[in-house]
């Protein structure tokens, strides 16, 4: 079970998906080669041996980077497992380097650096469903 975040290009003034036109089509993140180079530069510890599916491991968490095989890369899905708020640091570093905003698929809206409520809510839900923390 993972907390899923989508990195997507949105206009700077958009702070909530409710501000977006229904038919809005985001710009791609860029050519696949450039996106992979950005990931490698921002997250040097990421394993990109499978360039469509990278993995970044932290002390108490992991992030799977679903980059896909398309060229150009339209968006990137991050699948986060584990615990610890420090996982948000590489998420927002990568989002910034790619010129993206971070969409919390569980909450259905954008999150900002320091916005941990979605992550904490996911961990509570996960622990309740899996019986952990009892």
Task: Show the residue positions of the predicted features.
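Acidic (Asp/Glu-rich) sequence patches and key acidic residues
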Residues: 1-134
């Amino acid at each position: 079970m993972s907390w899923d975040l989508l990195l997507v290009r949105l206009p700077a003034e958009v702070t909530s998906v409710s501000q977006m036109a229904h038919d809005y089509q985001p710009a791609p993140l860029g050519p696949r080669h450039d996106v992979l180079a950005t990931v490698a530069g921002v997250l040097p510890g990421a394993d990109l041996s499978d360039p469509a599916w990278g993995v970044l491991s932290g002390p108490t968490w992991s992030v799977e980077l679903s980059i896909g095989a398309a060229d150009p890369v339209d968006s990137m899905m991050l699948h986060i497992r584990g615990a610890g708020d420090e996982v948000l640091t590489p998420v927002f570093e990568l989002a910034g380097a790619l010129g993206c905003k971070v969409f919390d698929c569980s909450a259905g809206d954008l999150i900002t650096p320091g916005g941990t409520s979605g992550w904490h809510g996911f961990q509570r839900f996960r622990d309740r469903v899996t019986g952990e923390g009892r």
